[in-house]
Regions:
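Gly/Pro/Ser/Thr-rich low-complexity, intrinsically disordered segments predominantly at protein N-termini
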Residues: 1-131
Length: 131
């Protein structure tokens, strides 16, 4: 995740979701703050793509779905939304919302020098709290 955008006020969840629909850039949301997502390298993209392809092939026909990079995960309702690099969900409740998933079975982050600290020390503890 990148740096917080310059904010004069905090964003409501509705403002964030509207911003995401209109913006060419992705941002993660945490308690009213938006964090611009950093671009990825070709190596990062290839690793995430390979993992996505592997998962997608393994779960074909099972009712599970694999997603890559551009789909939000709700970590805490109305408080915290992120974009995992790769996500797998098998929960029927996740079929209701095309843009946000809430019940992942597998989450993966491809670490890079620019995101490693944030992914390890901010996102990972929150991922581990998911049921």
């Amino acid at each position: 995740m990148g740096h917080a955008l310059e904010l004069k006020t905090r964003y409501s969840l509705a403002d964030y979701l509207q911003h995401e629909e209109q913006s060419p850039f992705r941002s993660e949301y945490f308690r009213g703050e938006l964090f611009a997502m950093a671009g990825t390298s070709d190596v990062h993209n290839e690793i995430a793509g390979n993992l996505y392809a592997l998962l997608k092939g393994r779960v074909a026909g099972s009712g599970c779905k694999a997603f890559i990079e551009n789909l939000k995960l709700e970590l805490q309702a109305n408080e915290h939304y992120v974009y995992p690099d790769v996500m797998l969900t098998c929960d029927a409740r996740d079929r209701a919302d095309r843009y946000v998933k809430r019940h992942p079975r597998i989450l993966a982050e491809v670490l890079s020098s620019g995101t490693e600290a944030h992914d390890r020390f901010f996102k990972l503890p929150r991922y581990l709290q998911l049921p």
